[in-house]
Amino acid sequence: MPQLNPGPWFLILIFSWLVLLTFIPPKVLKHKAFNEPTTQTTEKSKPNPWNWPWT
């Protein structure tokens, strides 16, 4: 029964996982912190009044 012989496919399985775990995580981690949150000030700014020229 050839499906019980791990010789032909086991090396391919190990090599594909090695390639996957070597190249994919750095590409994913590069885009992980794309939008870092910024700190906001606690003091409220006073809004400027609008100038309504048509009233």
UniProtKB/Swiss-Prot annotation:
Membrane topology category: Single-pass membrane protein
Transmembrane segments: 9-29
Region feature (Disordered): 35-55
Disulfide bond sites: none
Coiled-coil spans in chain: none
Predominant location category: mitochondrion
GO terms for MF: proton transmembrane transporter activity
GO cellular component term, pick one: mitochondrial membrane
Compartment(s) of residence: Mitochondrion membrane
One of the GO BP terms on file: proton motive force-driven ATP synthesis
Keyword entries, A-Z: ATP synthesis, CF(0), Hydrogen ion transport, Ion transport, Membrane, Mitochondrion, Transmembrane, Transmembrane helix, Transport
Membership in a protein family: Belongs to the ATPase protein 8 family.
Function description: Mitochondrial membrane ATP synthase (F(1)F(0) ATP synthase or Complex V) produces ATP from ADP in the presence of a proton gradient across the membrane which is generated by electron transport complexes of the respiratory chain. F-type ATPases consist of two structural domains, F(1) - containing the extramembraneous catalytic core and F(0) - containing the membrane proton channel, linked together by a central stalk and a peripheral stalk. During catalysis, ATP synthesis in the catalytic domain of F(1) is coupled via a rotary mechanism of the central stalk subunits to proton translocation.
Subunit structure: F-type ATPases have 2 components, CF(1) - the catalytic core - and CF(0) - the membrane proton channel.
Protein name: ATP synthase protein 8
Organism: Xenopus laevis
Underlying gene: mt-atp8
